[in-house]
Amino acid sequence: MTSSPTRVSESSRRRSSDPITWYLATIGREPLLTPAEEIELGNQVQTMMRLTEEGDREFSDLEKKLLRIGKRSKQRMMKANLRLVVSVAKKYQGKGLELLDLIQEGSLGLERAVEKFDPTRGYKFSTYAFWWIRQSMTRAIACQSRTIRLPVHLSERLTAIRKVSLELAHKLGAMPSRQEIAEAMAIPIEELDGLLRQSLTTSSLDAPVNGDEGRSFLGD
């Protein structure tokens, strides 16, 4: 029994000294989804998205339950596909961004893919998500390559966002969503999105990222 605190302490030290290795090991334990699970979870997320898009109103008890189910389903889909994010991120190492930054950018793309995935179209989620993940990473790399000098205050805020993202990744065992980052920083999600937008050029934000819909943008 006396060895348990030691094991916890050693685990904490490994997590602090090598967060990337710890994170990769953590997501590797998350089970993959079956095609049937993708459809079920995807439908639950879409129900949640439709309800949230209806605006600020009082939800019924059933709707509140559907929102909770949808949120859990979204988290499950994201955690089950983080290995895909890491796989894509490794292909873009050495192109201007650190691996952790690539994973963070790819996780934002994954989040958008989960929110927009329509199971009724018949394609695999990983195929759909890959495009969003890659798009998010390549845009971030393109922005970095322009070597735009950001204002000091903006640079500091972006550094804080990265720090909070890593801390949440340690806590959750997954890269956090924008909502989770905003809540941890005690700022509205609109403010977080505004900071992320400012770090990109207007051209990179105004380019459509979904040819089928024709009106989805990175900053959406």
List the predicted regions and their residue ranges.
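His/Asp/Glu-rich acidic catalytic environments and adjacent acidic regulatory segments
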Residues: 1-8
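Alpha-helical promoter-recognition and RNA polymerase-docking modules of transcription initiation factors
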Residues: 8-149, 153-167, 171, 180, ...
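Long, charge-dense, solvent-exposed interaction surfaces that engage phosphate-rich ligands
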Residues: 165-210
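Conserved alpha/beta core segments of nucleic-acid transaction machinery
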Residues: 145-159, 196-220
